[in-house]
């Protein structure tokens, strides 16, 4: 004890800093234990918050605003460890090589485990509409007929009639808001996916002609019920990549299935083979 005091008096402020660095070692150990215990508790908060049964705008999901609990935990650990280095610890007490070997996790990159565990979203097509999907395929791919465009009743008109039908049933305000969001989301997905995922190969020259004739028009104002129905065969795979939590996704699927029931109920007026016409010989040459 005497040798420590004699060496500390000439240093002045440095002796005080060394003593302050040595004193909190026990408290630092307690803090690390508390940190390990608290990290498990704090993860439950965001998960419960994301499970609120509310349909997000444009199906975006509240979880998009909050990073996954794993990334939050890693960020907190990094933030708590950095002050320890700034307080003046020597390299012998806090070895650097292990820290250099630890790679920082990028919160924007999905882990392999999360990708494998991603839920599969299945949209159930009503039995009444399945025969029409088969007939639509047969008319285009085997009989080489084309759905006449612009459609007599386009996708926008179908969605608007559905929304008006639901609102006329006396729904409360929050359900009316949800219907508006569902309709807007269906329209948005349709316009994005049509050119890449909703067309048969034989229809692509027709699509190119439509783009030239209507360069500024959204495809939901040009195409009709058959292509809208094709959307629901593909949309499940797309919904698996949205940041929606499980309850919000289940709520959304309920609205989508309700819309499909509406299509099935009105299938006689929405789906008819008379809307198709045999393609010309010139078109066949373009489609080769």
UniProtKB/Swiss-Prot annotation:
Q: Which GO terms describe its biological process?
A: chromatin organization; DNA repair; regulation of DNA-templated transcription
* Principal localisation: nucleus
Domain MRG residue range list: 117-288
What does the entry list under GO cellular component? NuA4 histone acetyltransferase complex; nucleus
**Compositional bias annotation for Polar residues:** 1-15
Q: According to the UniProt entry, which residues carry Phosphoserine? A: 71
Show the Pfam families listed in the entry. Answer: MRG
InterPro entries registered for this protein in UniProt: MRG, MRG_C_sf, MRG_dom
Q: Where is this region: Disordered?
A: 1-113
Q: Name the keywords, alphabetized.
A: Chromatin regulator, DNA damage, DNA repair, Growth regulation, Nucleus, Phosphoprotein, Transcription, Transcription regulation
Q: Does the keyword Transcription apply?
A: yes
- Does the keyword Acyltransferase belong to this entry? no
Q: Where in the cell is it found?
A: Nucleus
Specify the signal sequence span.
none
Q: What does this protein do?
A: Component of the NuA4 histone acetyltransferase complex which is involved in transcriptional activation of select genes principally by acetylation of nucleosomal histone H4 and H2A. This modification may both alter nucleosome - DNA interactions and promote interaction of the modified histones with other proteins which positively regulate transcription. This complex may be required for the activation of transcriptional programs associated with oncogene and proto-oncogene mediated growth induction, tumor suppressor mediated growth arrest and replicative senescence, apoptosis, and DNA repair.
Subunit info? Component of the NuA4 histone acetyltransferase complex which contains the catalytic subunit KAT5/TIP60 and the subunits EP400, TRRAP/PAF400, BRD8/SMAP, EPC1, DMAP1/DNMAP1, RUVBL1/TIP49, RUVBL2, ING3, actin, ACTL6A/BAF53A, MORF4L1/MRG15, MORF4L2/MRGX, MRGBP, YEATS4/GAS41 and VPS72/YL1. The NuA4 complex interacts with MYC and the adenovirus E1A protein. MORF4L1 may also participate in the formation of NuA4 related complexes which lack the KAT5/TIP60 catalytic subunit, but which include the SWI/SNF related protein SRCAP.
Q: Which protein is depicted?
A: Mortality factor 4-like protein 2
Q: Which gene encodes it?
A: MORF4L2
